[in-house]
């Protein structure tokens, strides 16, 4: 079982997602079984942020002086539920999710679901630096999204 802590440092998030912890828990509820870590107590933190703060994190930790949609900070390089109970942190930028500005709440939530899946896979050790890894990660993202797209949002 995965326990999520959600911290919001940007009040704009509450305009699109009223109960953010419930929202993210509902996403995890529909993940494929292999990602549920049944019988384990696994934790992760989500920081709902904005472009200003995610840009600072991106500069500090990746040496890229620009905002981005999501950052993942895995607790371990490759997560092993037998050795650790903390996956890591996912930071998501409101402005990236809210493009275009007239995006509907449903479309906003769908984007958040997709980017959460992406960040979650990074916490598990997936990466997309090499083309073959990119293809593998995209395939896995699509598989998870198909599991949950009609059930969440």
UniProtKB/Swiss-Prot annotation:
It comes from the Bacteria. GO terms for cellular component: cytoplasm. NCBIfam families: rRNA maturation RNase YbeY. Pfam families: YbeY. Its cofactor is Zn(2+). It comes from Pelagibacter ubique (strain HTCC1062). One of its GO terms (biological process) is rRNA processing. Zn(2+) binds at residues 118, 122, 128. This is Endoribonuclease YbeY.
């Amino acid at each position: 079982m995965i326990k999520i802590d959600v911290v919001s440092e940007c009040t704009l998030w509450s305009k699109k997602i009223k109960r953010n912890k419930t929202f993210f828990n509902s996403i995890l509820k529909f993940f494929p079984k292999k990602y549920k870590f049944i019988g384990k107590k696994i934790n992760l933190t989500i920081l709902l942020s904005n472009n200003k703060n995610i840009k600072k994190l991106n500069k500090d930790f990746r040496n890229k002086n620009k905002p981005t949609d999501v950052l993942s900070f895995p607790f371990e390089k490759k997560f092993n539920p037998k050795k650790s109970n903390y996956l890591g942190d996912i930071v998501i930028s409101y402005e990236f999710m809210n493009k275009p500005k007239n995006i509907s709440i449903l479309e906003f939530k769908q984007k958040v679901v997709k980017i959460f899946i992406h960040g979650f896979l990074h916490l598990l050790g997936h990466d997309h630096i090499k083309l073959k890894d990119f293809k593998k990660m995209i395939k896995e993202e699509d598989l998870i999204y198909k599991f949950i797209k009609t059930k969440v949002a």
